[in-house]
A protein has these predicted regions:
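Residues that mark the start of a beta-strand
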Residues: 5, 29-31, 168
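Short Gly/Pro-enriched turn/cap motifs at secondary-structure boundaries
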Residues: 10, 21-22, 57-63, 110-116, ...
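Cytochrome P450 core scaffold surrounding the K-helix E-X-X-R motif
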Residues: 42-48
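NAD(P)H dinucleotide-binding glycine-rich loop of Rossmann-like/cofactor-binding domains
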Residues: 94-172
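Adenosine-nucleotide cofactor-binding segment
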Residues: 168-171, 186-222
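Glycine-rich beta-strand-centered segment in the early N-terminal region that forms part
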Residues: 23-37, 51-98, 135-137
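Hydrophobic/small residue at the entry helix of a nucleotide-binding pocket
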Residues: 153, 177, 201
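Residues forming the Rossmann-fold NAD(P)(H) cofactor-binding site
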Residues: 179-182
């Protein structure tokens, strides 16, 4: 069996760079060659203290935000072929449980989860192939495409808030999600106030998100 390099999660604060078998795609699965992988805040938390939902059994793959190129497809896969540029969400709902029937898919009781983006290859399971594996548009880089899942959360949040031109929006906490939210709120025509503590992120709130006002919360600590 062919091998690959991968980062494996063994326990909180115990990750290892190892050589492991490449998992061949089964029926309805897709093998992707990783081109870009991000570090999510959840990855940092998982490294520090574990995650009972995202990683239920160790050792396991690690990392879940990625983009890449289809290397191989399993039997019955018709929507993707080797060479396709793709990005995937790290989960897919079952479509059958109490919450899915109410279209509250984020609360699905039987989520299919995917870890293992910190590797040369990742095998995307059937349900995620069917629901949340997407082709990357021409001209969009792998690095930017890998933001699809966190950006989708931001878009959903902006839609739920019903932001209108001229509204004033406060964003407290300007990590990647907060910065993207502030940027989209500006694109919706809102006046944006961004508040945080990190000097670099405060600068990004101005330069990237184009916030109208940036507040350094450290100035108000007692």
């Amino acid at each position: 069996m062919k091998k690959m390099k991968a980062i494996r999660n063994y326990a909180p604060q115990d990750i290892r760079y190892e050589e492991v078998d490449i998992q061949q795609p089964g029926d309805n699965e897709v093998l992707v060659r990783i081109q870009a992988a991000l570090t999510c805040g959840t990855d940092v938390k998982t490294f520090r203290r574990g995650h009972p939902v995202l990683i239920k059994k160790t050792p396991s793959g690690f990392g879940h935000e990625f983009a890449g190129i289809v290397e191989q497809v399993g039997n019955n896969v018709v929507d993707f072929k080797p060479g396709d540029r793709v990005v995937a969400a790290n989960s897919a709902p079952c479509g059958k449980c109490f919450y899915c029937l109410k279209k509250q898919y984020n609360l699905c009781e039987n989520l299919d989860l995917l870890n293992g983006a910190y590797a040369e290859f990742i095998t995307v399971p059937e349900r995620i192939v069917q629901k949340n594996l997407l082709k990357i548009p021409t001209g969009l880089s792998f690095e930017k495409a890998a933001f699809a899942e966190p950006l989708a959360n931001v878009v959903h949040g902006v839609e739920r808030t019903g932001i209108q031109p001229g509204d004033t929006v406060g964003v407290v906490g300007i990590g990647p999600i907060g910065l993207m939210f502030a940027r989209l709120a500006k694109l919706k025509g809102a006046n944006v106030i961004a508040a945080g503590r990190n000097p670099l992120k405060l600068k990004l709130a101005k330069d990237f998100a184009n916030a109208d006002e940036v507040i350094d919360l450290k100035k108000y600590q007692h």
